């Protein structure tokens, strides 16, 4: 993966924009470098006289006066982004030229640190732009993103293939690597390896071709980023009468009415399609034909059936990536992409997956058989269970066996209580953190909230933004990212945000969550903690800037706190009465967490294998767009995961993690890091899950360290284990 594409699209659950490789932080030399004109992007009338005007300073190019250096969204306009990007690119080019033209011998300080600092302004500006491009993509923001992408990719190419710059980096690596210690040594290694991995050792035609590929992939991913959200928005299922929504709660029906109103009211009600294959609403819909319509809208959203077709983009991206791998001396893209991960090779990942598939398959078959038998007992012996029936009869089966349903527990999962009395409370108990809402700090959308994060001694350590509710301008999924990464060298505290896609209740009503949405909030805040608790010297090494197959560990581990009784009891309170969840309901609900979990494992295994199947192909074998769907079927069949009842969590045509995000040949990392998370959760349970000293040890040995050391050693230092224990995964899922 090219450096810039990873910067812009590397999502956490998906979850984007977390790795700043060549784009770093703030410098002071704007005006002295002749950039004053770029900062004056619009004009305003002065009070002095008619016809007079004074330049308006671009707020993106000015150091923020807000606490923590937070973005001042009161001042930023959509028209500010491109002039700011252009000025910041110009500044980084000047900084790189200064490094190259330095007459002194290359040193760690005048080359490596200087390079780490060279993109500071561009990092600040692009972090804000790409945050909005994912979470509040108005037409103006979409246009700014479209214009920015080719400029940024061209900059990346110019830096990566700047032979004079790389020679200085290589000189430092060759002459100072042995003498440097700690984070200095790690930064040198990371900078050198990133240049090499991006193609700096290539020359001639190979280097030129790789630059062409980088530019083309950036363009294709921009097209994907426009097309898929549009396709998903158009996949909305319109419903003419309330009777068709039988089975939904009144709150869910009100949400369907509100969704229809926000999308033009083509019918009184609308069912919005989310990013995954299966749609949670199918668990409640009594109308089988409507269930079918919703499911088909999901799986056909972007395969050409309904006018939106991403397969041409998929085929070209896959072929170009395969060529990237070959140019870099590997047999395919996956082998190239995995070089600097914990897994190392596709073969290691396939061995890991086959171990899981072997244990999973009989459990999945038994689970499917049980649901089929239940459905036939309900509907008749000739009833044929379809994928759109799965959630519905599974929910009914759970209701019969455990006497529990989502509608029964949702009133106890008010989004505000889950966040403040659950997510924040767990962080307080485990890490000593406190959260103070800052209503004085502006946001890019009125639904957002901002919190100052304070350590146990009351000292501010981070700023945290929360953007919980779905809207037409927000892409699907949930993620963590940052406006600024932590760095002691820059004296910068982290500015972190979480984005989710929960339904916002009509005015005057509480916004309620499903259990899955509750765990999503804990998951994303696990990523946030990785950034909030970072205590690293250099920006490039801090927070979540770690290997993909490690980055999901803190988030998946943090999910474990959602069901710990002391935490659960603190947030699971009725949204109207404030009373805690009754003991019998709580017992039934917690027992239901692992009910029929073979499905969730199977859909993730299928998606993971799809991702790998596309990226282990040599360029000559990548299928054309018209053969892409057939390739998906063949790939799943060969690995033993072609299951009509358990489709991939993301099918090829809407697999945003892979084609629009930073998880190409990397979706396996969710399962890989789930093993790490299970092992760590076991350690917490044995030592005392809510004991501050246990949390402090995890904070000191893992969360605070970013990418400053060997990741496996961090894991081992905390757990005492030499290697992760994959056998713990299936039991942890109740399988």
Positions of the model-derived regions?
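Short His/Asp/Glu-rich catalytic/ion-coordination signatures at enzyme active sites or charged loops
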Residues: 65-80, 129-148, 171-212, 272-312, ...
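C-terminal, non-catalytic "cap/extension" segments appended to globular domains
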Residues: 52-75, 80, 87, 268-270, ...
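Short, hydrophobic/amphipathic alpha-helical patches that form generic packing surfaces
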Residues: 121-131, 193, 296, 390-398, ...
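Short pre-active-site segment immediately N-terminal to the catalytic Zn-binding motif
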Residues: 505-521
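Intrinsically disordered or highly flexible coil/loop and linker segments, enriched in small
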Residues: 39, 90, 94, 98-105, ...
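Bacterial Sec-dependent N-terminal signal peptides
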Residues: 1-50
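Active-site-proximal, well-structured secondary-structure segments within enzyme catalytic domains
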Residues: 187, 219, 226, 231-271, ...
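N-terminal helix-rich structural modules
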Residues: 46, 51-256, 684
